[in-house]
């Protein structure tokens, strides 16, 4: 695990979007870190609302979080954020507790 750089983590989360990370990318990548954009679009139809470039960016930024071992810390950051709705924060907290190392 790479030491956590909170500024970099926040930039990655911002590029992905908190809701997209919690509801789409974290659940997908926790099961398969090499999931393709096409598979994401098939499994999570709401991912289709993003342009192809945005889909690639969001997936690659989320993979970077996982590669650094920051996936649970990202959930914690989101669960403490005041910049997303309470449902997303609650789901992030539930996932954080479930996957905490």
PLM regions: where:
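Short Lys/Arg-enriched helix C-cap and helix-to-coil transition segments
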Residues: 67-83
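Basic, low-complexity segments
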Residues: 1-7
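Short coil/turn linker and secondary-structure boundary residues
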Residues: 4, 32-35, 50, 83, ...
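Helix-turn-helix/homeodomain-like alpha-helical modules used for DNA recognition
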Residues: 87-101
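DNA major-groove recognition helix of helix-turn-helix
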Residues: 59, 63-66
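Short, basic interhelical loop/turn and adjoining N-cap
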Residues: 42-57
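Short, amphipathic alpha-helical "recognition" segments used to contact nucleic acids or chromatin
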Residues: 9-35, 62
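Short acidic, hydrophobic short linear motifs in intrinsically disordered regions
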Residues: 36-40
């Amino acid at each position: 695990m790479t030491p956590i750089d909170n500024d970099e983590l926040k930039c990655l989360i911002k590029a992905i979007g908190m809701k997209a990370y919690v509801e789409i990318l974290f659940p997908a990548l926790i099961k398969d870190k090499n999931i393709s954009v096409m598979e994401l679009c098939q499994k999570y139809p709401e991912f289709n609302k993003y342009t192809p470039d945005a889909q690639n960016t969001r997936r690659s930024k989320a993979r970077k979080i996982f590669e650094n071992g920051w996936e649970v810390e990202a959930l914690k950051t989101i669960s403490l954020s005041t910049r997303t709705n309470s449902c997303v924060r609650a789901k992030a907290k539930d996932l954080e507790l479930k996957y905490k190392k």
